Amino acid sequence: MTPSVAQNTKYVNLFIGTSGDNGQVAPGAAAPFGMVCVCPDNDPRSHAGYDYAVTKVSGISVNRLSGVGCSGGGGNLRIRPVAPSQELHIKKSREKATPGYYSTAFTNGIKTELTATNAMAVERYKFPRSLSAALWIDFASTFEDVATCHYKRISETCIEGYVQAKNVCGHGRYKLYFSLNTSHPFQLEEQKETTACLTFGKKVRSVEVRIGLSALSSELASWECARWEKMDFEDVKSRTADQWEKQLSAIDVKGGKKDDRVIFYTSLYRTYLSPADVSSPDGAYLGTDGKVYISEDFRYYSNWSLWDTFRTKFPWLVLTEPAKMRDMATSLIHLYATGKKDWSTGFESTPTVRTEHAVILLLDAYRKGITNLDFRKGYAGMKQEMERLPMRSPDQKMESAYDLWAMAKIAEIIGEKADSEQYRQRSVSLFEETWKKEFMNVTPAFEVMKNNGLYQGTRWQYRWAAPQYIDKMIEWVGQDSLRSQLTYFFDHHLYNQGNEPDIHVPYLFNRLGAPEKTQQIVRSLMTEPMIHKYGGNSEFKTPYLGKAFKNAPEGYSPEMDEDDGTMSAWYVFGAMGFYPLLVGDEYYDLTSPLFDRVLLRLTNGNVLTIQTEGRKKKDAPIKSIHFNGKKIADYRISHNELIKGGELIYNYK
């Protein structure tokens, strides 16, 4: 199998954000929207298992979540090519990672290469003559507590079983069945309840391990391995590399610095890592009620971090992957039908985080053209969720007002007029009561992290958390006063790029008559050093001065989690010059693109060209914007207009 020439994947630097608490991502081998991300786990580890700054390795595991909090999730079926009593260290000069592939050498002479399909990890180990080929496997390894595990030798080259572990932050459980197959027969030694050693004899110098995964059965996990048995390691690697090249070749950019292109395509790559397609070949999937269902008309997805990703990543997938997004949205509707919690349930198919604000995501997909969604199927579950929305703190009330607003729109779509009006009134009254009491009159307490029970933020940051009601904020405060307050917010470094609650706020200047402020702030956030006063949970004792996005292992500002593609999608939107300020609305707010020219090939066959003209300075303000010859006066463009393709031209002063 001949690999395609790397065009845009050559710009991807998988080590961005892998060092310390600066992103919490990993450079593992993965396919787009796959169950597998196979990678070394360091000791001590990050949330994603891997830490660029640490050379000591506890082993190589098959899965992890990208950039999430708590202790992460995954870390299953960890393999060590040396005994647990011996230390294993990465030789950093030999480390390499490209989309779908990871390789390194260890200081003891062992070399490893990793690649993956959607549901199979492929691990190749090469041993020096001084060492006998052997693999120590921990069937109970996990980044959270393991509940149960079981393994059984099936043949001289195969072990099958399952592992059940707690999900992120200790909520709920997932269960993975596996089929582990080796290229050479093994002897099973040092066998214990959850661990074993596989030895291969003195003559074997190279061992390949293929681990198929399934949420349903070991038989399906075995089928995953059998599916690719005629393809060798290089074939699998090339196939996955081609998948990534196709995924990233939908967008071409010109202009900007090389670091800008590297950060852009690395960010683009990370928007397509999840959620995971967990359906069996015949469409079977595990419902969150523990029952197995069969779908004939969609693929079932799992692995959610919606509190973060509804804001940017899923609007990005609505635009660039509408067919897959239809399946993802349908999966969420089925989640409502089989039993949805805000966090993980007890019957998950993969490691997963949380699913708040799914109704906003579903509304966004519908209003942007993905209308073949059966809201009726999940409507009862949605209604139940509306009755248990959290209301303990001001931030929860603001976010619940957003959910109720979206639910009102969904009820209207399916003809439930009484429900729609009830949810609309609840949303408006909840927002008005909360905003006027907690957020309208600015006090010094607005700068205090977690004041009055706020989650990972300040009152300043949550003040803008209901963008659907920006007109009401203007009505109560006045546009000039609100703009002055927003300017103060940025001038005094009260904005936090390192967490999600206020990442849409730079675009509010468009709605307040100062679009040049949006342009200046967004570009600065993407490219310039800035003062960061806040981390994820507290105010820094000494503010951090530096870039929020860097082409380096410390790729994000301190304590800034990449959050499963959220921050990556934020960067991609900003670099292209438009952004979904109000998720659930059909409009994008416009800003100055980072690049001189962007070509976006849409899945409907249309091509959108974004072009800058007359920009002599990188921070020059926009003079006018035209779409297919028509002037855009309000710095907004609808999704349905954008996907027609054509030319979006930015002219500069």
Please state what every model-predicted region is.
Residues 1-2:
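Bacterial N-terminal signal peptides
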Residues 5-314, 318-360, 367-390, 395-398, ...:
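Accessory carbohydrate-recognition regions in carbohydrate-active enzymes
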Residues 399-403:
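Hydrophobic, small-residue-rich alpha-helical packing segments that form membrane-like cores
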Residues 405, 409-412, 443:
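Conserved, charged catalytic cores of large soluble enzymes
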Residues 434-443, 448-450:
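Long, well-ordered, tryptophan-enriched scaffold segments
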